[in-house]
Amino acid sequence: MAKAPNTAAQRVRKKVRKNVSDGVAHVHASFNNTIITITDRQGNALAWASSGGQGFKGSRKSTPFAAQVAAEVAGRAAQDQGIKNLEVEIKGPGPGRESSVRALAALGIRIVSISDVTPVPHNGCRPQKRRRI
């Protein structure tokens, strides 16, 4: 006889609540989207959210408000994991840089430091052509 097929309910992993008080918020702010990932000090992801994942599509993804909403969602999920203090690392030139940090601070999470880790080329690849609007 054949075995009974595995159902999806048997394979679902239960989220384990980690008690981590300090973490790092990685804000990737591109021109098209903003992604916020909150990790512990070792780099293990605790929570993440993006402005596209919050229901914003197209050009609305690249707004400061969309980044604020995504930061609030990621921040609440990180608080559920026990996060109280965050170091913020911002990467990219997008419009969601500042509003995402403000949203994390408004949740009551203590911002320890803010650093810009945007990669800057030492005369590497040729940049894209200038936009003419």
UniProtKB/Swiss-Prot annotation:
UniProt GO cellular component terms: ribonucleoprotein complex; ribosome
Entries under Gene3D superfamilies matching the protein: Ribosomal protein S11
Entry keyword annotation includes Lipoprotein: no
Molecular-function GO terms, alphabetical: rRNA binding; structural constituent of ribosome
Pfam family, one: Ribosomal_S11
UniProt keyword annotations, A-Z: Ribonucleoprotein, Ribosomal protein, RNA-binding, rRNA-binding
GO terms classed as biological process: translation
Record keyword Calcium present: no
InterPro entries the record matches: Ribosomal_uS11, Ribosomal_uS11_bac-type, Ribosomal_uS11_CS, Ribosomal_uS11_sf
SUPFAM superfamilies, alphabetized: Translational machinery components (SSF53137)
Source organism, top-level taxon: Bacteria
Subunit structure: Part of the 30S ribosomal subunit. Interacts with proteins S7 and S18. Binds to IF-3.
Function (record text): Located on the platform of the 30S subunit, it bridges several disparate RNA helices of the 16S rRNA. Forms part of the Shine-Dalgarno cleft in the 70S ribosome.
PANTHER family: 40S RIBOSOMAL PROTEIN S14/30S RIBOSOMAL PROTEIN S11
Xref: NCBIfam families: PRK05309.1, uS11_bact
Family the entry assigns: Belongs to the universal ribosomal protein uS11 family.
HAMAP family named among the record's database cross-references: Ribosomal_uS11
Name of the protein in its database record: Small ribosomal subunit protein uS11
Gene source species: Methylibium petroleiphilum (strain ATCC BAA-1232 / LMG 22953 / PM1)
